[in-house]
């Protein structure tokens, strides 16, 4: 089995690094396409041994599982470009925020009657095999197709199937979640520095506190509130700190952040469905198209079947 990424940005780089680190795929069975070959992420993929090309069509031809790892407003253009090259063997996995299964299927059905589409939302901690991924299968995807993606994504963290109508909310929760954690960690470190702790040590201790708290929660059946209470002694420093957080609306800020991300995801969905693109984004898209028309620079390995993950496209049953 081979995996392709349309787009060679942060997500593609994180997934490729995670898959190779987990041992489920060797780098030569991964291909990524990008109109720009001087990006830091492209350099990182090259160092891993991943095949690189400027041609999205090459990526489709040399892959079985195809990740659409580009911005939502680019998806319609990409599907128009590669639709004729998508075959029955392909599992098309959309990772773009807000882009629905039906919108991808509608585009691809102009080229073939039963495209296998899966919508996926993951996050950047896949790079250290601690990602959080959910997926929903499309009309024509087989049960085995979903299980194959789940097996692949479970190698880089937690993965589970959900109904598609939950994915926008999950984008705001775990998709954007690492950014909330990094901002919180940055602020915790600032607090430590303010009180005299060296920056490097403050960052390390703050990160370890978040890591340890997450592990305690995942390894127990206790409610987060109970674990929080266990840290607070009567009249102690922690309860005074929590009072300060509560008075500043800490909980409401996090709730509102998840809501804001979810709402924006739905706005992106509407823009993608209507193929609305901002002038700046349109200019970049046109420039990328010009680059794609230039001679292809690629280092391609022939598609081959992997030993760890296999599937037979002739078998399986469609989801009801």
From Swiss-Prot:
| UniProt entry keywords in alphabetical sequence | Acetylation, Amino-acid biosynthesis, Cytoplasm, Mitochondrion, NADP, Oxidoreductase, Phosphoprotein, Proline biosynthesis
Name the source's superkingdom: Eukaryota
Query: Pathway of this protein?
Result: Amino-acid biosynthesis; L-proline biosynthesis; L-proline from L-glutamate 5-semialdehyde: step 1/1
What Enzyme Commission number does this protein have? 1.5.1.2
User: What residues does L-proline bind to?
Assistant: 164, 237-238
**Main subcellular location:** cytoplasm
Subunit details: Homodecamer; composed of 5 homodimers. Interacts with LTO1.
Q: What is the recorded name of this protein?
A: Pyrroline-5-carboxylate reductase 2
**Provenance organism:** Rattus norvegicus
